[in-house]
């Protein structure tokens, strides 16, 4: 059986404040601009995935193309500046403590996108856990 979750070359930032580097998924807080404004204030000029993602709250803004261009530019800049440490052929074990004290465990690796489908009722090995909003896919493709 071909398992579509594997080891891969994983990039992690070096010498970075990880509390500012990581942000929640871009499809969260879609109706709470204050949340994203607060995150931007916390991050400030520090390196952050906030500058590498397009929170869905901004998908309808007039400057979405400018945001996408900035994201792509930020990605290129970080690669050119040798900002990351590469862990070749790896998986990374993660632990996260929730506000209630419960520890969540995870494993970071790579997935074969040929084994993924967002279509309802799909039987592919990797499926969406919630309904996908098709209109939100094109901006994501421009970023990747």
Where are these regions (language model features)?
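A cross-family signal for N-terminal binding/gating loops and helix N-caps
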Residues: 1-143
């Amino acid at each position: 059986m071909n398992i579509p979750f594997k080891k891969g070359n994983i990039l992690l930032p070096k010498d970075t404040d990880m509390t500012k580097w990581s942000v929640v998924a871009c499809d969260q807080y879609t109706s709470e601009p204050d949340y994203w404004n607060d995150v931007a204030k916390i991050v400030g000029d520090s390196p952050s995935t906030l500058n590498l993602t397009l929170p869905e709250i901004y998908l309808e803004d007039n400057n979405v193309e400018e945001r996408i261009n900035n994201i792509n530019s930020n990605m290129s800049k970080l690669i050119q500046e040798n900002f990351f440490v590469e862990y070749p052929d790896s998986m990374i074990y993660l632990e996260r403590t929730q506000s209630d004290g419960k520890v969540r465990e995870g494993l970071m690796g790579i997935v074969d996108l040929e084994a993924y489908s967002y279509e309802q009722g799909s039987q592919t090995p990797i499926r969406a856990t919630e309904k996908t909003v098709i209109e939100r896919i094109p901006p994501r493709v421009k970023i990747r």
